[in-house]
């Protein structure tokens, strides 16, 4: 029988970012209580020897699974140390990979207090609303003018330690798109 390969998108991540992510997740699961219901699995609880940790985040009937890996093939540079992370959205019989922005948005739909756009209408109607958003990483677009005005009045409160953001976990120098040099900076185009 031949080998069957499964291709996954794995974001290359610095080892220290993975340690920080795991620490933040465990802090908010066990100490602050903001990540209630999240499941943290250690490397020894996985059958895959490449998995270093797994965080399962319940999202209604589905769940978001953030898996960190070690011992992967290194990248082009010396600092690509073979560490990585993948994000997967799973429901009963279906799963798909998601990017860090979408992962943060999915987390924010179910967790952490937020001052959302619907709060503007509620504030106008005289209802009590949450004054700030705890999880800024869950917002990817610029809000309406009213939303921006209200957020300018009420500064976001810094939470120590910060809430775990998947986007922040994958944010690194080798995951950013490469900037190409202009005509002046390219040696091959100048003939030098």
Curated annotation (Swiss-Prot):
Protein name, UniProt field: Virion infectivity factor
InterPro entries per UniProt: Vif (IPR000475)
Gene Ontology molecular function, alphabetical: metal ion binding; RNA binding
Site-annotated residues for Cleavage in virion (by viral protease): 150-151
Extent of motif HCCH motif: 108-139
Region Multimerization: start-end pairs: 151-164
UniProt gene name: vif
Induction (UniProt): Expressed late during infection in a Rev-dependent manner.
Post-translational modification comment from the UniProt entry: Processed in virion by the viral protease. Highly phosphorylated on serine and threonine residues.
């Amino acid at each position: 029988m031949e080998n069957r390969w499964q291709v996954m998108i794995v974001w290359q991540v610095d080892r220290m970012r993975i340690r920080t992510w795991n620490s933040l997740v465990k802090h908010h699961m066990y100490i602050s209580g903001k990540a209630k219901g999240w499941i943290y699995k250690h490397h020894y609880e996985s059958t895959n020897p490449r998995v270093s940790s797994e965080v399962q985040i319940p999202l209604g009937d589905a769940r978001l699974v953030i898996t960190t890996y070690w011992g992967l093939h290194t990248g082009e540079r010396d600092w690509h140390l073979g560490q990585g992370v993948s994000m997967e959205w799973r429901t009963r019989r279906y799963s798909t990979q998601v990017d860090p922005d979408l992962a943060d948005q999915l987390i924010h739909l179910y967790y952490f207090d937020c001052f959302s756009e619907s709060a503007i209408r509620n504030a106008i109607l005289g209802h009590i609303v949450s004054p700030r958003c705890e999880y800024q990483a869950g917002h990817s677009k610029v809000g309406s003018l009213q939303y921006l005005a209200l957020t300018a009045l009420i500064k976001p409160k810094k939470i120590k330690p910060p809430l775990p953001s998947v986007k922040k976990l994958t944010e690194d120098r080798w995951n950013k798109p490469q900037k190409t040099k202009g005509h002046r900076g390219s040696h091959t185009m100048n003939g030098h």
